[in-house]
């Protein structure tokens, strides 16, 4: 369960959404990589990064990737990124995954850019790495990357209308096509746990946790549900009490979802969830693209341990 902290949120000024959080072993700082929000029709075309030493005060660093300047295969709708820090031959390298609108008019596709620093500069690989749906419908968006601490293997997850996962090749720039797995959690409703988008995966105490968002990003009812599994590619067992983050109108909190999760380094079992919510002033006017980033501690009291 996530514990809403009204006073501390939002943590970033302005409109941002779909936050990915990273703790860098190289710099000993925290970073958030969000969708740039506030544009009608989710029309943001660039990604920024924010940094912090303490998870409380955040500094805007820079634009790290601009679809119109830095990416040849895309022209806009820069959405929902994720990042992985890898130590390769004694040097740190950063793999930044994102979705964007393809210049070939084939809809949303997923790309990857690389850097030697959490703040870039990032260089795009030059082509999308996920271009089509394994189920023939839905969107190739909302990418997540996860490295399994038990094997060292890295995995990519994505999907809107479906959830897919695949093992990444060692270069982190492509997936092993034969491992692509449709993982969509079965069942549920918009009020409970029906999968919509935004998969997120992490590992704790021998268990793989799978989080996803339910309903629509412009709805106050947009919320987070979860399940668990015994392998990075499922199958996913939906939890008995699957909802872990949902609106609280009395606290003026609406549509809290599309999250990432952080285990605080050097602390035994301290975790935070970073997510966006709808800015309360825009509930009736473009709620889906007036979102703000928040952070709350996670309690495992009611979650499978």
Language-model region placement:
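Short, catalytically relevant binding-site loops at active-site mouths
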Residues: 163-164, 172, 187-190, 208-209, ...
């Amino acid at each position: 369960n996530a514990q809403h902290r009204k006073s501390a949120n939002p943590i970033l000024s302005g409109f941002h959404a779909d936050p990915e959080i990273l703790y860098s072993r190289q710099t000993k700082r925290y970073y958030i990589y969000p969708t740039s929000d506030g544009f009608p029709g989710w029309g943001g075309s660039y990604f920024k990064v924010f940094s912090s030493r303490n998870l409380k005060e955040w500094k805007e660093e820079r634009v790290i990737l601009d679809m119109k300047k830095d990416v040849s295969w895309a022209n806009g709708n820069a959405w929902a990124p994720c990042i992985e820090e890898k130590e390769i031959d004694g040097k740190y390298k950063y793999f930044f995954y994102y979705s964007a609108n393809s210049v070939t008019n084939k809809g949303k596709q997923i790309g990857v850019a690389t850097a030697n620093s959490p703040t870039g500069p990032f260089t795009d690989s030059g082509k999308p790495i996920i271009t089509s749906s394994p189920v023939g419908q839905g969107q190739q968006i909302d990418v997540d990357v996860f490295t399994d601490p038990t094997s060292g293997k890295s995995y990519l997850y994505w999907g809107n209308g479906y959830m897919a996962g695949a093992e990444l090749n060692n270069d982190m720039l492509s997936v092993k096509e034969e491992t692509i797995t449709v993982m969509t959690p079965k069942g549920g409703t918009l009020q409970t746990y029906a999968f919509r988008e935004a998969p997120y995966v992490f590992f704790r105490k021998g268990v793989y946790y799978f989080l996803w968002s339910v309903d629509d990003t412009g709805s106050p009812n947009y919320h987070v549900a979860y399940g668990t599994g015994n392998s990075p590619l499922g199958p996913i067992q939906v939890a008995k009490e699957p909802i872990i983050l949902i609106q609280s109108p009395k606290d003026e909190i609406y549509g809290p979802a599309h999250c990432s999760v952080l285990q605080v380094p050097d602390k035994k079992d301290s975790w935070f969830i970073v997510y966006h919510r709808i800015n309360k002033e825009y509930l009736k006017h473009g709620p889906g693209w007036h979102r703000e980033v928040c952070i709350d501690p996670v309690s495992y009291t009611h979650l499978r341990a």
